[in-house]
Structures are given as C-alpha cells and as structure tokens.
Amino acid sequence: MKLSIVQKADNTPTEQYLLEHPKENAKSWSSDPGAHGWHRYVGRFPAQLVRAICNYFDLSENDLLLDPFCGSGTTLVEARLLGIPAVGIEISPLSAMISRVKSGFNVDTSDIEEYITRLEEFYYEKYEVFLDGKDISEYSYEEIIARDGNSICAFSNYDKWFTKEALLGVSVVVEYIIKIRNNRYISELMATALFAKMRSIGNVDVDVVRAEYRKTPRENVNVLKLVVSHLKKMVKSIKEMKFSHKSTIKEA
C-alpha cells in the first residue's frame, strides 16, 4: 500500500511523498514519517488521514485547528508541517508531553545536538564515578537506587524489570533530564527518547501491548547508546521535515 495519496503534482513530488521517501528511488517507505515515529503509541490513527482531512477542508494559516483528544500529537504534527495553527487537549501527562515534543521542535537542531554531546559527557562521568573501578555485578540494586543523584524511587520487582546496568543507565539519564529541566523542550525531548527505548532497555517483550517479563534478561544493555541513537534519529527527521515542508513549516 502506498501512503501518499498523491505522489506528484505537475511532475513535482508532494511534500508528504518526500517525507515518506527521504531518499530518491528508495525501495521502502516509512509508515511513521518525521516526528510521527518518535514514540510508539498504540491506537494512533494514521497521519495520512489527518493530512487528507486538512486538505479536504482547505485549512490554512488563517484557521485554528483544535484536537480535543490529541493523544501523542498526530494532528498537531500535521498542522505544524502544513503551517496551520493548532491546539491540542490531552489528560494523560505522558501523552501530553509526547505531543508537545513531536509538534514543538525547532527547525534549527544545533541546540539539540549540543545537548546530546553534553548528555554523553555527563553519562560517562556519572556512570564511572559510581562504579569506582568495580564491575556492576559487585553492586546491589539497593545501592544503585541509593546512588547520590538518583531520583528513581524503589519499586517492587525492579530486579525483574531491569538488569543492574540498565537501571543505573536509566538513573543517570533521568538525572541529566532533571538537571536541564529549565530548558523544558530539550528535557522533554530526551525524556521522550528514553521512554521510547524503554522496552529495549528493560526486561520486557517488545512485541506485546501489555508489558510482560522476558524469560531471559537482556544482557549488555547500553542505555546511553540506545537513547543517543534515538535522539540522533529525531534530529535527522527534523531536518527531513524542514526540507520536505520548507514552503509551509514555521518555527514553533
């Protein structure tokens, strides 16, 4: 199935087609192009449906689009790409945060890239200071939770949900997110990236809607690598959205 309803107009590729096919003559397309793929969200309707409705009603920068149940922000993202002012309402704090992050990005990614570098430096320092030359296996879960700078509260069965290295890694990333919370967008962007990779970090099956323990714990979990890799994909997609929708996208 092709995602773009219209691929070309007067032999010129449409903006949606460019976003779904960032490379010319690509053999595959993205079902969650741009910011839509930043965080998995069960029950989210296709972005192409929103795009089609906006086009049908000929919405423009002179209109105001309201999504009273915005979820993860699919409608808000499409409105942002099309230059349509939009407002979303969402009761779930997590969903509201994801929608803000997906629709509120700055098209200039230099600030995000700088914070990614700072995250890497912070992570290596905090991780190594805690280990103090020892192996992670020499520490207990309780010692990781009691780590100076940790803000994750003790919870039941954390030894089943996370390996020690994964719990320590998440703890350090969360510490950094809190440290930079004065920059609300960047801190929420990084939190979204962390949450998006949580199924790959924790001892859970990734292919089920309800979280369930894995039969075998994940080994050699590198939280920083997973989070930074996702952040860089987010940066790449911002650049793609800026290019594919340069005629309509506006600053947040």
Label the predicted regions.
Residues 6-61, 82, 87-252:
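Nucleic-acid modification enzymes, centered on SAM-dependent nucleic-acid methyltransferases
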Residues 73-77:
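Glycine-rich SAM-binding Motif I of class I
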Residues 61-71:
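Conserved class I S-adenosyl-L-methionine
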